[in-house]
Amino acid sequence: MAENKKKPNINLIKKVSWPNDLRPNPDQLSSVTDTYFLRTRDVVAEFGDTEVTYAIFMRRPVISALNPALDWLQHIIKERKGNVNINRCFEEGSDVGAGEPMVYISGSMLLLVDLETALLQKIGATCVAAYNARSMVESLRQTSFLAMDARHCAGTDMADLMAYGAYIGSQRVKSEMNAIGFIGCATDKTAHLFQNTKGLGTMPHALVGYAGSTLKAAEMFHSTWPDQPLTVLIDYFGKEITDGLMICRSFKHLANNGTLSLRLDTHGGRYIEGLDVAGSYAVLERNAPESIRGYRLSLIHI
């Protein structure tokens, strides 16, 4: 790998290992590659190879989060017993402007031409995820974030990449200022990115429904996992305030030692207990008028 041309914008990004089941493997590659790349490879094989250089860029600002993609590329090149020159323009976690090349990849066209599909799949979304994670952590510096990518992604490969993006974006902010950032993810596979051995999480809505009450669900969970911090989902019955206070009173000892949390996972179609649309606006107007006025103004400008 050639030496980086631009210094990183961050102090330190901790080196982490990446899941070793990098896909697609050489046997799977042709079935998930765009046909026109496969046909181009056949043409090059027929009429003669040549040296090429790929410049990979994004059409929008992102955070550089290339390691999974480049690790996969180097794995495939090694399997093919070939060589390429990889020249990174940005260190991991650095700002990348729209249209700026992030990395140059040079080598045999025959070796590289059918790798573009899988390579780009691992770059675009990951870099955007890192950018979004950075924005979240920067905006709410004293908030702990949990990466819940697993159930929202189109497969485990995408979930791995989203967890990595969350890690990079979070580390970027933490290297520059005092911020908590992402403290974990939902699954064991990528927990090491956040210096954990296991995924984090307590209860989905299904457990509250199974238990029949918010308090009963909390009691059942705590009985089963007494040494785990307790995060209680309090919106199942639409009584967020009533159930939230009940949980705090019932688990006062956990609240006192900082291991009790309340979780809201309410969709945008309803409002917190006792409020409706008008009531919600009235609360904002009384307590934080600039928040909703600024939001409305930004919508008008958009």
Residue ranges and their predicted role:
Residues 2-12, 92-96, 103-298:
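Buried, small/hydrophobic-residue-enriched core segments of structured protein domains
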Residues 2-113, 117-126:
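Flexible, solvent-exposed loop/hinge segments and secondary-structure transition points
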Residues 300-302:
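Conserved small/polar residues in nucleotide/adenosyl-binding loops
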